[in-house]
Amino acid sequence: MHCPFCQHSDTRVIDSRVSEDGTTIRRRRECEACGERFSTLETIELKLPTVVKSDGGREAFDARKLRTSFDRALQKRPVAEEQIEAAVRSVVHQLRMSGEREVGSLRVGEYVMVELRKLDHVGYVRFASVYRSFQDVADFREEIEKLERELPVGSEQLPLLEVALERAGKPGKR
């Protein structure tokens, strides 16, 4: 690293300390030529792919938007914060491991749907209704029936269509 005082190219590290959260390292350096001391901060750079939107626009991946998608789909659902965080980490990990510089928003949506399907079927259908632009009740019914056909026997989650139909008949249960 070049010295910021004399621009000499040889500096040595005289002390290193890891931050409390473990995400940065503070290094105290000394210039071999002029003897001046200075500090540097070293952080991890994790490059995530750029998201290509359906209209062709490109934007940097934003983990907050991803978290918001999960929060909206799972609003008022019995899913623990830790489970949601793990699902977000899983999607981010899949994107990072893809090794691609760009990824389509449709692929990100598919990753989200896989995670939601594991967490909560109602949240999954909520997300799918927006992601796949459901037009009417038949689209919901088709997705729910498809989901129920693919469920393993003895699944812990309630059968969606039965719950939806039962609630539809009771006022105030929306």
Curated annotation (Swiss-Prot):
Record carries keyword Manganese: no
Keywords, alphabetical: ATP-binding, DNA-binding, Metal-binding, Nucleotide-binding, Repressor, Transcription, Transcription regulation, Zinc, Zinc-finger
GO molecular function list: ATP binding; DNA binding; zinc ion binding
Cofactor or coenzyme needed: Zn(2+)
Top-level taxonomic group: Bacteria
Binding note for cofactor: Binds 1 zinc ion.
Pfam family, one: Zn_ribbon_NrdR
Gene Ontology terms: biological process: negative regulation of DNA-templated transcription
Family stated for the protein in its record: Belongs to the NrdR family.
Role this protein plays: Negatively regulates transcription of bacterial ribonucleotide reductase nrd genes and operons by binding to NrdR-boxes.
Entry-linked PANTHER family: TRANSCRIPTIONAL REPRESSOR NRDR (PTHR30455:SF2)
Name of this chain's protein: Transcriptional repressor NrdR
Biological source species: Xanthomonas oryzae pv. oryzae (strain KACC10331 / KXO85)
